Curated annotation (Swiss-Prot):
Protein name: Glutamate-1-semialdehyde 2,1-aminomutase
Enzyme class (EC, first level): isomerase
Cofactors named for this entry: pyridoxal 5'-phosphate
Pathway membership, UniProt: Porphyrin-containing compound metabolism; protoporphyrin-IX biosynthesis; 5-aminolevulinate from L-glutamyl-tRNA(Glu): step 2/2
Keyword vocabulary terms for this entry: Cytoplasm, Isomerase, Porphyrin biosynthesis, Pyridoxal phosphate
Gene Ontology molecular-function annotations: glutamate-1-semialdehyde 2,1-aminomutase activity; pyridoxal phosphate binding; transaminase activity
Gene3D superfamilies linked to this entry: Aspartate Aminotransferase, domain 1, Type I PLP-dependent aspartate aminotransferase-like (Major domain)
Upper taxonomic lineage: Bacteria, Pseudomonadati, Campylobacterota, Epsilonproteobacteria, Campylobacterales
Organism annotation: Campylobacter jejuni subsp. jejuni serotype O:2 (strain ATCC 700819 / NCTC 11168)
Short name of one Pfam family: Aminotran_3
Similarity field: Belongs to the class-III pyridoxal-phosphate-dependent aminotransferase family. HemL subfamily.
Modified residues (N6-(pyridoxal phosphate)lysine): K263
Amino acid sequence: MTNKKAFKETCKFIAGGVNSPVRAFANVQSEPKFISHGKGAYIFDIDGNSYIDYVQSWGPLLFGHCDKDIQKACQKALHKGSSFGAPTLLETELAKLVLSDFPHLEKIRFVSSGTEATMSAIRLARGFTKKDKILKFEGCYHGHSDSLLVSAGSGAATFNSPSSLGVLEDVAKHTLVAKYNDINSVKELFEKNKDIACVIIEPIAGNMGLVPAKQDFLEELAKICKNNQTLLIFDEVMSGYRASYLGSYGINHIQADIITFGKVIGGGLPAAAFASRAEIMDILSPLGGVYQAGTLSGNPLAMAAGIASLTKAKKKTKLYDKLGKLAKKLTQGMKKLADEKGLPLQACHVGSMFGYFFTKDPVSNYQDALKSDLALFSKFHKNMLENGIYLAPSQFETGFICSKMDDKIIDTTLEAVRESFKRI
């Protein structure tokens, strides 16, 4: 069966033909590739085509596809049982592994998705502060829970809808929206609202394209939260163990009250988490009155994959230097080639994350990102795919480098960029 036939068939049974909207390739006027398997830095579709994969399952695969150590850990766990609905020692081991490197985090709770992690973190913040409102930033995506689908990035940006049908006004009214990297917009909202329970932010935004928050902005944001008895939540579902081993904390050294994790923490399996100091975490049920639960939370296969992934990342001291150098080579190479062709392009990287925008002006917030030439991006994406390079099918997503990539792969990619720029 071909990709085209597979998508047509799938659309008969799965809404939209996909289980997450961006996978449909709708915003690049194309149809998705159905993947048969992956190996290292490559994926292979059912038509027999191979691609250098810069999506890496949207970030979780720090060590690429089919990493032997992670596979071995999963197989060992599977032989003992796939799920118990009861505590296992694997949960404790992964909890210790995560918390050991964050001096301000004392306890953690595992869930199955980033959406669950951010949703639970906000409920926890409201329960702890006894306040109602939350403040988020325009273009930051924190999953698809109702209160966070307001001025969201990622899928919402891709499909030109700042919110979603089905989100009640009574829910949305409790969500305040500030401008990313603009501290004055934050101050204005705090002046008008005295009941803000938490501020949630991607300290390294990856869902309006890659847009890092400025150091002075984050420092001032932390001060405002502290002065107003408002909890600061860093959503590191994407940037955790990607920007550095310690995520944004390893770069900005700001101690958020709550951190959410995901993607890499599960080693490619469904897992996420939220963590904080004990006095906050201890109001979670069964100790306190904030309820959170999940049938597959702390699933042993996901815990085993997470332990293997993080242990390997921690041992390889030069891993992040290597990934960062490759990401830098890629983005600088893209910028140079674009300049040579007179194409408007902004490109940057943070650790193993990279992003690019088809716009002539620097991008520091959501409105800047929206100025990108989407038609140009669509043409570029199509040409890169034809040249064997699998990039995220949205201008408003982030790309990822994995450990199985090397200079040769980056050189191959840049040659594809050169050819694609010639055609567009």
